[in-house]
């Protein structure tokens, strides 16, 4: 309280504006943390990274024969380009998950005829998931029903970076492959396929739009 006859002193800058500046700093900090949290979330439709359990799994030098209990990480065989018909060492899994490939990949789609491994490996490099099937090895479902289910699944996922293709040399009914990852089973399991797509699609070493 200022008594009569006293000169009233003007408040200093910090005394006058200090509380306002403090509140502003808190608001800016909160906004920054919120934006950082949003940036760390995957965008809608974007594939999430493989689980840490699979990443920590030792890479297998030889591919699984017969059904697996889940995705198996394979040893990387490189990404060398070769010419059509050019010889190369054998792939370490059936179907392959990395290695020698042609310069031109296949378009996404549901195919009625097999596609050369050397073409499909290029798709894997671009982050594709390839669903291979062999009707002779299927259990619990007919071939026509499987094809219809896979076509519907392809359309459900809008066909982005997915190829469905028959593979007569496959030793199981269905095989899922992505770059360095393989999963094989005999009975159609849509949730298993969708989980594989969610985890491993668009995880190849070359990032492309299609």
Where are these regions (language model features)?
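Terminal targeting segments of Actinobacterial cell-envelope proteins
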Residues: 1-14
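N-terminal organelle transit peptides
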Residues: 14-15, 54
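Hydrophobic membrane-insertion alpha-helices, especially the h-region
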Residues: 20-34
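C-terminal region of N-terminal signal peptides and the immediate post-cleavage residues
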Residues: 32-51
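Low-complexity, Pro/Thr/Ser/Glu-rich flexible segments characteristic
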Residues: 47-61
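Mid-length scaffold segments of soluble, non-membrane domains
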Residues: 109-157
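Helix-rich interaction surfaces within compact, conserved domain-sized segments
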Residues: 149-210
């Amino acid at each position: 309280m200022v008594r009569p006859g006293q000169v009233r002193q003007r408040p200093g800058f910090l005394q006058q504006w200090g509380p306002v500046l403090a509140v502003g700093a808190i608001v800016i900090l909160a906004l920054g943390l919120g934006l950082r949290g949003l940036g760390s979330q995957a965008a809608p439709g974007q594939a999430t990274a493989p689980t840490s359990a699979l990443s920590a799994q030792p890479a297998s030098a030889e591919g699984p024969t017969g059904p697996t209990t889940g995705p198996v990480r394979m040893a990387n065989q490189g990404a060398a380009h070769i010419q059509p018909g050019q010889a190369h060492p054998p792939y370490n899994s059936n179907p392959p998950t990395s290695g020698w490939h042609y310069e031109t990949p296949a378009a996404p789609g549901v195919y009625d005829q097999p596609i050369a491994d050397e073409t499909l490996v290029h798709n894997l490099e671009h982050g594709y998931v390839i669903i291979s099937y062999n009707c002779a090895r299927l259990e619990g479902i007919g071939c026509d029903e499987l094809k219809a289910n896979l076509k519907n699944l392809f359309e459900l996922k809008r066909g982005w970076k997915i190829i469905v293709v028959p593979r007569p040399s496959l030793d199981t009914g269905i095989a899922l492959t992505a770059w360095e990852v393989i999963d094989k089973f005999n009975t159609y399991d849509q949730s298993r396929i969708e989980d594989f797509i969610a985890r491993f699609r668009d995880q190849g070493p070359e990032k492309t739009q299609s």
